Amino acid sequence: MKNRSFLLALGAGLALSGCISFGAKPPPFLLRLTPAQEGAAGAARSAAAGQAITVAIPIVGQELMTPRVPVHSGANQVAYLKDAQWVEMPSALFARLVSETISVRTGRVVLDPRQFALDPGIRLTGTLRDFGLDGDRMEAVVVYDAALARGGDRVETRRFAARSPLAAMDGASAASALNQAANQVAAEVAAWIG
């Protein structure tokens, strides 16, 4: 009797396992951002107190709180690109790209927000307003509203935006075009910080 109950339960479990799916099928590959220039291995930097820059992960709207790539169509429609997904949230990828670009282009010491206690000098924060595709114009679009706090007495803000042509509406083309636009914005942010 016990064997029969066990076999019946096992058979039911196997039958159900073919019906249950624990998540969507992953895309064939994941997307990431790469800096146009990378710092040399072993390069040492130092900064006087208050001169290190901390780059915070930007604030994003609900549309970008996913590793998927948004595609805008018309004035009010958003869909997500099929089979395209970032390795992590685009806001974190963008923050690291900006950090690396500032470090390479300015020679400044750039800290991760978790290192903020080491030197709470200059702080770059902001909102990543757009980081996706314009389906009507076949372009990648990056819009970043930056805020730079230099010490406790002054804050500067500036909007940075870049567009890059999109060869095709697929993951590889999206990654390439968004990488190009993000690098352009990161270079402009680095020039602004100086």
What does each model-found stretch correspond to?
Residues I20-V87, P120:
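A structural "domain/chain start" motif
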Residues M1-L8:
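Bacterial N-terminal signal peptides that target proteins for export
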Residues N76-Q85, G152-A187, A191:
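Short secondary-structure boundary motifs at beta->alpha junctions and helix caps
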Residues I20-A36, E100, V104-G152:
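Surface-exposed short loop/turn segments
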Residues A15-G18:
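C-terminal motif of bacterial Sec signal peptides marking the signal peptidase cleavage site
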